[in-house]
């Protein structure tokens, strides 16, 4: 499919279209976190607060979802509310885009799905909570998130709080290395682990300055090296959960999922909801804090990338 034909599926909101026309930096946001990652009304409230943070820093937020047979880039208040309340939105990764677009049903984009749509819309930076990855026990199940393949093929910089701690983070990083995806960190040397700050695994490069991050990313793409760059930043210390506690609760939730025969796309929403229940809601507060922090890091990166692009033109 030609790029023009693919872009014909896009509907940009007025603010996103105006920002793109003016050359203002854009930050893509996923919708799975709204539809499946948090309960209502915290999901919609957090979405509004994250968008406001990005705007305050000088970039334009572009939350992405599939609505009525269109890829919507930038959502209205009513569309955010619809996503947050629905409970029936499909999780949309690469394989699901054709099905949900042709059916016209409501679709919430995953990391992979959002990367594809962001690239079509010309957006270079995407902020999420945590990426998917290699699931524990993948040696037997082959349960590996499509997010990792998308990072290898789609040229979007992804800002996250590491990989979700329910995953095998060591194998996730090994997979990314095999696929040639650079893993950057800021604020610390080690890759983050979602609810907790430190996964115990060292990342490829630490770059704290947004201008340095932008130069790294721009150089990769200038060399014709297609694919994304992953930038990990830890959850703020005040909101982080203790490693021993979250590890034990994660294992308990995983055991429950296995006992109940929960597999595939249903695993992550089940685990997040179960951990929220087991922590009395504290994990949700941590999730909200890390997404907001990621949004700040992502907005600054988008500004730096835009400035670097202007400098190259000059």
UniProtKB/Swiss-Prot annotation:
Binding site for substrate: 91, 111, 145-147
Keyword field contains NADP: no
EC number(s) stated in the UniProt entry for this protein: 4.2.1.70
Database matches in InterPro entries: Indigdn_synthA-like, PsuG
Catalytic reaction list: D-ribose 5-phosphate + uracil = psi-UMP + H2O
Co-factor requirement: Mn(2+)
Catalytic residues (UniProt): 30 (proton donor), 164 (nucleophile)
Cofactor note: Binds 1 Mn(2+) ion per subunit.
One cellular component (GO) term of this entry: cytoplasm
The protein's enzyme class: lyase
Keywords per UniProt: Glycosidase, Hydrolase, Lyase, Manganese, Metal-binding
Purpose: Catalyzes the reversible cleavage of pseudouridine 5'-phosphate (PsiMP) to ribose 5-phosphate and uracil. Functions biologically in the cleavage direction, as part of a pseudouridine degradation pathway.
Assigned protein family: Belongs to the pseudouridine-5'-phosphate glycosidase family.
HAMAP family given in the database record: PsiMP_glycosidase
Stated name of the protein: Pseudouridine-5'-phosphate glycosidase
Organism per entry: Cupriavidus pinatubonensis (strain JMP 134 / LMG 1197) (Cupriavidus necator (strain JMP 134))
């Amino acid at each position: 499919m030609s790029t023009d034909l693919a872009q014909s599926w896009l509907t940009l909101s007025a603010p996103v279209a105006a920002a793109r026309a003016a050359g203002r930096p854009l930050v893509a946001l996923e919708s799975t976190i709204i539809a499946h990652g948090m309960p209502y009304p915290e999901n919609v409230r957090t979405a509004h607060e994250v968008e406001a943070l990005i705007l305050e820093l000088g970039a334009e937020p572009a939350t992405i979802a599939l609505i009525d047979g269109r890829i919507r880039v930038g959502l209205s208040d009513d569309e955010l509310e619809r996503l947050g309340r629905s409970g029936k939105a499909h999780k949309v990764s690469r394989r699901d885009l054709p099905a949900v677009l042709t059916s016209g049903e409501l679709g919430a984009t995953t990391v992979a799905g959002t990367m594809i749509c962001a690239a079509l819309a010309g957006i270079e930076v995407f902020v999420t909570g945590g990426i998917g990855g290699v699931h524990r026990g993948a040696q037997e199940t082959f349960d590996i998130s499509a997010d990792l393949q998308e990072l290898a093929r789609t040229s979007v910089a992804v800002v996250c709080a590491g990989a979700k701690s329910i995953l095998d983070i060591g194998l996730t990083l090994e997979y990314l290395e095999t696929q040639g995806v650079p893993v950057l960190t800021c604020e610390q040397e080690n890759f983050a682990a979602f609810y907790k700050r430190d996964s115990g695994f060292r990342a490829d490069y630490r770059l704290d300055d947004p201008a340095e991050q932008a130069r790294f990313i721009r150089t990769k793409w200038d060399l014709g090296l297609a694919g994304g760059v992953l930038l990990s930043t830890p959850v703020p210390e005040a909101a982080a959960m203790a490693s021993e506690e979250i590890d034990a609760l994660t294992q308990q939730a995983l055991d429950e999922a296995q006992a109940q025969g929960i597999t595939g796309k249903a695993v992550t929403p089940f685990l997040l909801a179960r951990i929220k229940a087991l922590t009395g809601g504290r994990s949700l507060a941590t999730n909200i804090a890390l997404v907001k922090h990621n949004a700040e890091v992502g907005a600054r990166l988008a500004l730096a990338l835009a400035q670097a692009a202007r400098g190259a033109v000059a």
